[in-house]
């Protein structure tokens, strides 16, 4: 695969690199006195130099003969050097930051490349949204490697999205220079039941010899998992149990260990390696979804490496999991992922391996960050008008919009979605609720809130009604346009008045997240770019998110990253019960179910 993510292709500079390695020409940069973390052999090689030319590595070893008058020399002074870190699965939209601001935030932490699945913005704006994010990334040093969204909508027939992506669209995007594969194939039922659409988008990717990324959340690891992998899917980030992760690795599937803002899977899935003493070559560390306050407080892959080490994974193994393993997963290890001759000169200097403290970051042979601060400029991208005005709701939302009716009854037994804090799954519960004036009442005493999803893309007027449990809210309401994956307007709350205020607040600001109580807005994060992102800097976004978290606590919710958990309520490809703008979905059987249980 031709790498568009370096300043110059190898074939164009091969003569120069060979000459520099032999001392016939001086290097552009030489790193001296380093302790090389060799991810190819999983060892530390002392007193190693690295010569760099044309944005690539020319020599690893003694590089004194490569130094000329114009060569920039960086003395590592005994620090470790490692390949730049690669995040194998990330939705930038979940950071609420633009791509350029995201790059500014993560590069100083050693992240040199991301495999970005922009299926959030694609669900709102279609492939135009993907193009906008690609353009946004071009002004940054970060290597923005993009996978075409595979499931827009996530599960066809169960929700309304702003756009749809089919095999023909995938075929076209595989011609784009920035596309390296197919985004997570969430429609595993479509693969297992051999639908033309699911196999069509996978097939177009395989025809282009690019990587199909996966999403297999079922605990079944027998014939279903085998069939899924056999279709061409190469990796999966949805393992939450060690046995699932181990089963996938044993079948040659790159298994991505997730540690994000809300999903803390590493503690459990790391046992696949530490508890079984198996080869880790098919294991990758990823973030998936990370909020701005997490990036500001903890960092990015540097933090995830540290967490892996804390869970008992050897430091060199953890670094392999964000470098060569990831590059091999995407069939790009001939370009990325190791400090070896010919590869992209993407290098991080690490003061110590225990705390994974990054002191310098080099991308394509350029020093781009030092001591946690970006040392290069990043161009700001202005998103087009259609991206900035994405709220299209047909009917005016009032308190009456939240009525759930049950004629001539005093009580009903409702299907209720119970969330699992810090996990992506849900439980289906059957709970008795009171009816007053033919209107079903939520019951905060039982931790049961009302939930409504309004379609916001095409002014259809469709809305889905349900109940949720597990947030702990006693009084108030929350709303968000970050509601995976269709990103319709999701509102949950204890009373119709606060729910209407929450919904209308987001309509007025172009989307985002809000918490209200007693007719007052307690916390608001405006996200005007497709209702998903903002152009504001990380620090400002983190402050707003912290205030929103405080607002959540004020109204009674103390779970970790509650908006991320809330955002998965409509995601119909995850078990067990979900709510979309079309109604309640049994995600084990993939069929609509009634809100009320028949007695």
Swiss-Prot record:
Pfam families registered for this protein in UniProt: Adenine_deam_C (PF13382), Amidohydro_1 (PF01979)
CDD domains: AdeC (cd01295)
SUPFAM superfamilies (alphabetical): Composite domain of metallo-dependent hydrolases, Metallo-dependent hydrolases
Record keywords: Hydrolase, Manganese
EC number: 3.5.4.2
Cofactor: Mn(2+)
Keyword Manganese annotated: yes
Broadest EC class assigned to this enzyme: hydrolase
Transmembrane segment boundaries: none
Single GO MF annotation: adenine deaminase activity
Reactions it catalyzes: adenine + H2O + H(+) = hypoxanthine + NH4(+)
An example Gene Ontology biological process: adenine catabolic process
Family of this protein: Belongs to the metallo-dependent hydrolases superfamily. Adenine deaminase family.
HAMAP family in alphabetical order: Adenine_deamin
Name of protein: Adenine deaminase
Naturally occurring in which organism (per UniProt): Clostridium botulinum (strain Loch Maree / Type A3)
Gene: ade
């Amino acid at each position: 695969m031709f790498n568009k993510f370096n300043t110059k292709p190898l074939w164009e500079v091969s003569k120069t690199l060979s000459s520099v390695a032999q001392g016939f020409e001086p290097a552009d940069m030489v790193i001296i006195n380093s302790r090389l973390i060799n991810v190819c052999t999983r060892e530390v090689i002392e007193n190693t130099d690295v010569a760099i030319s044309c944005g690539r590595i020319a020599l690893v070893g003694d590089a004194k003969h490569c130094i000329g008058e114009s060569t920039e020399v960086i003395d590592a002074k005994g620090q470790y050097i490692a390949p730049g870190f690669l995040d194998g699965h990330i939705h930038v939209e979940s950071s609420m930051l633009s791509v350029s601001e995201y790059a500014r935030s993560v590069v100083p932490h050693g992240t040199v490349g991301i495999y970005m699945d922009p299926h959030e913005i694609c669900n709102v704006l279609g492939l135009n949204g993907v193009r906008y994010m690609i353009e946004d990334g071009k002004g940054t040093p970060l290597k923005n490697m993009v996978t075409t969204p595979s499931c827009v909508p996530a599960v066809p027939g169960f929700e309304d999205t702003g756009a749809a992506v089919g095999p023909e669209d995938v075929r076209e995007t595989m011609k784009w220079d920035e596309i390296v594969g197919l985004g997570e194939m969430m429609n595993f039922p479509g693969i297992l039941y051999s639908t033309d659409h699911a196999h069509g988008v996978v097939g177009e990717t395989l025809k282009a010899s690019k990587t199909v990324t996966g999403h297999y959340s079922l605990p079944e690891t027998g014939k279903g998992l085998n069939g899924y992998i056999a279709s061409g899917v190469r990796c999966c980030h949805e393992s939450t149990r060690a046995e699932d992760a181990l089963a996938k690795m044993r079948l040659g599937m790159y298994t991505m260990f997730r540690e994000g803002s809300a999903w803390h899977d590493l503690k459990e899935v790391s046992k696949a390696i530490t508890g079984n003493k198996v080869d880790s070559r098919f294991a990758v560390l990823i973030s998936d979804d990370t909020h701005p306050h997490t990036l500001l407080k903890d960092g990015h892959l540097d933090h995830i490496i540290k967490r892996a080490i804390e869970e008992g994974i050897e430091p060199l193994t953890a670094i392999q999991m964000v470098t060569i393993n990831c590059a091999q997963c995407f069939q790009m290890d001939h370009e990325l992922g190791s400090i070896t001759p010919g590869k992209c000169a993407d290098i991080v200097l690490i003061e110590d391996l225990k705390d994974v403290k990054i002191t310098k970051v080099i991308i394509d042979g350029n020093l781009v960050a030092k001591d946690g601060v970006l040392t290069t400029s990043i161009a700001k991208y202005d998103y087009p008008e259609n991206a900035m005005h994405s709220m299209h709701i047909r009917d005016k939302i009032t308190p009456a919009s939240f009525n759930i009716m049950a004629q001539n009854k005093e009580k009903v037994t409702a299907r209720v979605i119970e969330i699992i804090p810090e996990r992506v799954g849900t439980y289906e519960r059957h709970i008795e609720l009171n009816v007053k004036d033919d209107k079903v009442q939520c019951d905060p005493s039982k931790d049961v809130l009302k939930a409504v999803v309004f379609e916001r893309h095409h002014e259809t007027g469709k809305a889905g009604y349900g109940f949720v449990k597990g947030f702990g809210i006693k009084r108030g309401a929350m709303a968000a346009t970050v509601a995976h994956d269709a990103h319709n307007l999701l509102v949950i709350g204890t009373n119709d008045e606060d729910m209407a205020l929450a919904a209308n607040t987001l309509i007025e600001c172009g989307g985002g997240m809000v918490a209200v109580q007693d007719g007052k807005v307690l916390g608001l994060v405006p996200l005007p770019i497709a209702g998903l992102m903002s152009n504001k800097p990380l620090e400002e976004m983190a402050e707003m998110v912290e205030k929103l978290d405080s607002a959540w606590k004020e109204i009674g919710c103390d779970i970790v990253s509650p908006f991320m958990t809330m955002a998965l309520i409509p995601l119909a490809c995850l078990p067990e019960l979900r709510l979309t703008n079309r109604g309640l979905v049994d995600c084990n059987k993939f069929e609509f179910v009634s809100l009320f249980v028949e007695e």
